[in-house]
Amino acid sequence: MLLSSGYFKRHKTKKRHRSLSALILSLLFAVSLFGGCSADINSAESSSPNGEVTPPEVIVESPGPVEMPAEQEVPEVPEIDFNVVKPNELGEVMVIMYHNLGDKNTDYARTAESFRADLERLYEMGFRTLPLRDLVKGNITTPAGYTPVVLTFDDGHITNFKLLEDQTIDPDCVVGIMSAFAEEHPDFGMHATFFFNGGTPFAQKDSVAFKFNYMLENGMDIGNHSFGHEHFKPLSAHEVEAALGKNAVQLKKLLPENYEIDLLALPYGERPAEGQRGTLIEGQYEGVPYKNIAILNVGWKPSVSPFDVSFDFASIQRVQSGDGHLQLTDWLDGYAANPDKRFISDGRADRVAIPAILSEKVDLTGFEGLELLEY
């Protein structure tokens, strides 16, 4: 059955396709045949959604009316075979936590070769990258039958994004590897969020502007990791505000005016005392406010779906990269054995499709414009 709810309202747009040349020829032909007929032309022009000027309406008084080309609707996403795709948009979503690349694999470092292998395995298993913001807003644009995955990188290490002496992107840094992979597999995407502390992002002062522009142009985001990588547990509310607000202010100076620093990865996974935790969500620094829409833990398991009744944007679990127990490789092995646990998209960003047996677990409160389909 269909229930209305959801986060964004989407409007279907019809495009009008008219041939100006055909209209003019038809008009001239009608005038030449019926000299006594008059033509009343409306001179008002309008613009279509793609910026093209729509030719004026032409009204010809003649025994035979001028036929206008039929309106053509934008093709809709074809409906899926639910018995084949078996969408489950209450399944688990991995938010993967990386840090830097290194010469050997550790709990916080991944070799370039292993990172490439991670991307390849994710792709082959049907995962496709999704922006963190889209996840928390319920804007799941993942194709039908595939699973969204969110890639995150903490600390802004130079191995995340490095320029060589000739100012080309190092093919063995994270962004270089992702760029090359996306060229070969464009449907995988390049969506990822990089979380920064104070100091020079990616440790190359003269290239910060280029790097940030490149990231934003290619679907990557910038997030907050606190100014000094503070331990939040002993801090007061004022100290937490300073750590987050100061870093947000510094990052915004390097970004377009309308870009929001509203994504937070908790350093060390720590939170302040119970009464101070509201400052993780919002606060201000020297009169400049900040407000986070996603707060990430240093987790050890996948996140629940954003449509799950237990989802909490202020406490999103992450999967640690690596090959050990409860790290990325371990979880991928688990999904290979139990694929039904994964979030499986129905291919419709304006709809949430779930097996009817899970109806008690869904909660679309706060998501406007979405439809719920149970099957």
Give residue spans per PLM region.
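N-terminal secretory signal peptides that target proteins for export/translocation
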Residues: 1-16
